[in-house]
Amino acid sequence: MPWAWNLVDQLNSVLFSLRYGHKLKKFRFKTPHKNYQIIPICNIPTDALVKFFAHQPNEAYKFFRPHGFDPKSIQRLKENKAFLAYVLIEESSGHIVGYFFNRSFFHGKGFRGRMVDINYRGRGIGTMMNCLLNEVGFSIGLRLFETVNKNNEASYKSAISASKVKVIDKMANGDLYLEILII
């Protein structure tokens, strides 16, 4: 019943926009990020996002499966007002070096996710993107959460480096369900 989930997503998008849209219109990232541009995915061509995801190695998807990566799925996300997603673009090359999002809900929760391009790992970009997600999420009044697997060392370190966290649950698959706390 994918149509039912699509309907729920559309309803959530409308309700989220009614509740948080005015705050999002006023929001601007406070911290300038030298050498990078932060662009909402609605302003990025769908094929550029699909190409970014296709460029990542299979191991990048072992712990990262938040949505489909095909053109139709990406286009649907771009139209969803509750899916606060951005890319980080390196100014010198124009390359997308990271993708990050808060999957948000009208009742006030958001779930963080991010992916750093394979060629840009180990530079602190994941931690930077987490800080940006905190900035937008907390500024509009969301409670933020994340699931992260301790076996995914880079993502785990990024989550705890960027934020004060509270472990809500240790899940059977090894994931930790974290609440991101305002510092």
PLM regions: where:
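Conserved acetyl-CoA-binding loop-helix of GNAT-fold acetyltransferases
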Residues: G122-G137, K157, S161
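Conserved active-site alpha-helix within GNAT-family acetyltransferase domains
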Residues: K150-D169
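A short, internal acetyl-CoA/4′-phosphopantetheine-binding micro-motif in the GNAT/acyltransferase core
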Residues: G113-R123, N149
